[in-house]
């Protein structure tokens, strides 16, 4: 019984990870189809990093917990930086 449950949960986890990776690849390929050069993608990444860092610092100075509002679209705020989720 335990082995079956572990196998089912493992398969479900692999399926979720595979689906997430496939969605990221599809989104990246759509960006590249539009013709956005790598330099523009890097600029977007730097902008998100800056926005997240500034947002976290402002909230920390106000003695509030850092809420990760600025990072969206597969990004999350970690250590005052937006990182790919």
UniProtKB/Swiss-Prot annotation:
It comes from the Eukaryota. Residues 1-22 form the signal peptide. PROSITE patterns: HWTX_2. It is found in: Secreted. Expressed by the venom gland. One of its GO terms (cellular component) is extracellular region. Coiled coil: none annotated. InterPro entries: Hwtx-2-like (IPR012625). GO terms for molecular function: toxin activity. Disulfide bonds join 52-66, 56-77, 71-82. Belongs to the neurotoxin 12 (Hwtx-2) family. 02 (Hwtx-2) subfamily. Postsynaptic neurotoxin. This is U4-theraphotoxin-Hhn1e.
């Amino acid at each position: 019984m335990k082995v079956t449950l572990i196998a089912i949960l493992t398969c479900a986890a692999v399926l979720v990870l595979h689906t997430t990776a496939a969605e990221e690849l599809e989104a990246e390929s759509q960006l590249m189809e539009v013709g956005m050069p790598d330099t523009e993608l890097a600029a977007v990444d730097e902008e998100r990093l800056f926005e997240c860092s500034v947002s976290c610092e402002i909230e920390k100075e106000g003695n509030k917990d850092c809420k990760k509002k600025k990072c969206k679209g597969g990004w999350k705020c970690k250590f005052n930086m937006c990182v790919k989720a």
